[in-house]
Amino acid sequence: MNFIRPRRFAVFSSLVLGFAATAAVHFQRLPAGGMQPQAATDAAHTVHLLWLGGEPKAADVFYQKLPEGRASSDAPLRVNSQPGSAIAIGTIRGAQFALGRQGRVHVVWNGSGGALPKPADSAPLLYSRLDDTGKSFEPQRNLITRTTDLDGGGTLAADTTGNVFVLWHAGTPGTKTTEDKRRVFVTRSGDDGRAFSTETPVTDSSGACGCCGMKALADDDGNVFALFRGARGGVHRETTLLSSRDHGVTFAVSPLQDWETGSCPMSSAALGVSARGMLAAWETKGKIYFRPVAPVAGEAGAPEEVTSGPGAKHPALATNARGETLLVWTEGTGWQRGGDLAWQVFDAAGKPTAERGRKPGVPVWSYAAAFARPDGDFVIVY
């Protein structure tokens, strides 16, 4: 398969001299014991935060709104109706969320060992949404009806017309589930998550990396994008883009970058909307790469290596109103091991600014999220 050759973009001081930082970066800690934050901002500049808390092997999912990114006096809402039905161990199978029509919050997560309801041949993929009052979440539901052996984390996207798309990789009923035979599946809702279709395959049986997560996002035009890691032949673990221009009915499959390894790296990826189009960030060989994947005005280009240290994982993206983008990731995290934050701000043309850094304090089983404030500055949540 053909891949775009990456451009090396190591971020050292000698490379950023002459760039004036415009957006500053601020930091916000999760509540005590919080892990695996997710952040999204709506049209009213309200920041929506999601995170895990409690026991890592039997965690809870929490949600909170921050008006214009400021601290809120409202207590967080627990998303999961069954206590301890989420899982933080592994840093891959936690909760993800999306904002749909009229700002409704949709959440999906891999179920813990005791999570219910449970399908016959798999851990559950659980879903809930904010109810019509906006004050609590509906009882959790399992979305798996026929696939087997859920492993790496599922994902979801939602658009402004009531469509919700939930994707995960799994085995096919009646066949032995090996990594090189796993497929990506999607279930769709056209009524704001009230009901979902039976899952259908998006990819062929050429594989998906078992313990790696996925990331999905819908743009303002209702196009749906998702990232997953393949497992072609059991060794070609390429970061792969799925893109749908027909509201999730069909998906084009585009490999972005190969990684030849016989073992699963337990990686995650990020998507973000910017003036340059849809942006993607992912891990390859312990480094973070970054590029537009649905560019405007014909812009494309090779993946850019942006990391400055070893063991880079778990990227997240945020873009402000000026078109500047913050890319944040972790360094040194691993199994039962926390690590550091690292970040780089890019200008509206995608060039690195002088705003970059590294900071300790990422907890075990965690990573960072980010959002842009109305004044253009960025906040990293960890």
Pin down the residues of each PLM region:
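N-terminal secretory signal peptides that target proteins for export/translocation
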Residues: 1-5
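Short helix-onset patch at the extreme N-terminus, typifying the N->h transition
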Residues: 6-8, 278
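Compositionally biased, low-complexity segments
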Residues: 9-10, 77
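Bacterial N-terminal signal peptides
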Residues: 10-20
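Extracellular, repeat-based ectodomains that mediate carbohydrate processing or recognition
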Residues: 23-382
